[in-house]
Amino acid sequence: GADIQEFTQLDTAEKGRELVERGWNLFNRLAAVRYPTLALVRGHCLGGGLELALACRYLLAVDESGTKMGLPEVMLGIFPGWGGMLRLPERVGPAAAMDMMLAGKTIDAKRAKRMGLADDCVPPRVMENAARMLVLSNQPRRPLPFMQKLLNGPLKRVVANGARKQVAKRARQEHYPAPYAIIDIWAKHNGNALVAPELVDGIVRSPTARNLVRVFFLQERLKSFGKSDDKSGDFKAKRVHVVGAGVMGGDIAAWCALRGLTVTLQDQSMERIAPAIKRAR
């Protein structure tokens, strides 16, 4: 994926637009080459990494538990501006693409093949031979079904309206503008954020994006605290105390409990804690 540290340096509107333009133009050049190109995906391929893979003619996924693909930019309060909003709907259809982009979902290799994101899903032992065969075959990519083409073309408004309604149930635009920007840029500008500089400026330097990027780095720092200097292995947590029983806190508590940890949950009242316990059950 892209270097998230770079986002912290976007202190002017011009820098934000330059960052989007650089990736957009580069990946468009890759997508336009006449010779076959292939992305062999093994491990995490997220954000800018998947946008690079989408610019290739073929995408071959390695069937391992660690192979994950997604466009999770919305989790940082931003959008996939390097071609992901254009090419993902063309690959998998707009409904599936919106589901991935608006929720920041990641998928494994098998699901990537089923939904049409990956041309094939192969075990590690044959990945290099499979990549060679796919490139040399020069076969056309599997086309989108006719109805999906309509939804990605003349009927875009239908998908966009439905997506806005779903997003509105989870977040208000003034507090969380990124998913609304993704819908608008795809529906009105064919995924090209450069045509809507006011959206780029408003999203990239928004307080929401700054705070979510800060949260990301804090999470990464917390992960490092769980590492042990002991040569016997990493520190193994046994008990977790979660402060705040909102949607995120409640889901973290449930996730930890499902993995066998002893979990306690804290908030200002039982009325705030009860919904989290109900969801966990």
Residue map of PLM features:
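Phosphate-binding active sites in nucleotide-utilizing proteins
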Residues: 231-281
